[in-house]
């Protein structure tokens, strides 16, 4: 999937792209722009056009400006835009919600990060991407990730997933269950 990264006035306004995002795309420099609307920037438009896709998956900070303005213009220019609602943010929840209403009324399709990832996965038999998808699900998808982890460890006997930066404490006490630790802590 082609990716276009963009930042706005990093030296005077917004700062650099978050390192957690940049780390996913090493050697992929963000397009620096001055306009809040990325679609006003000829370099951004050229990068999107070079990708040759008419379906755009868009996410970003400041839903009511950076995301909404670009979305409305892309729709006007014939693109089909999917706004990843849970990967956008704004100064208030109300501002975010109103911006999402605006882009949906203009014709954008609201999606979530999980729905995009699973649509791209499409088939659990696609083993080339399955392990990475499951790692993302377990690390970032709440109850779904917990269910996947439970099924893997309790039903299929897999070892617990070790996430970077986390350790799984040894469960001592009553048969290794948390209840044993709680009882010991009360004693």
Listing of model-derived features with the role each one plays in the protein:
Residues 11-187:
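Active-site-adjacent betaalpha module
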Residues 2-8:
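Short beta-strand segments at enzyme active-site cores
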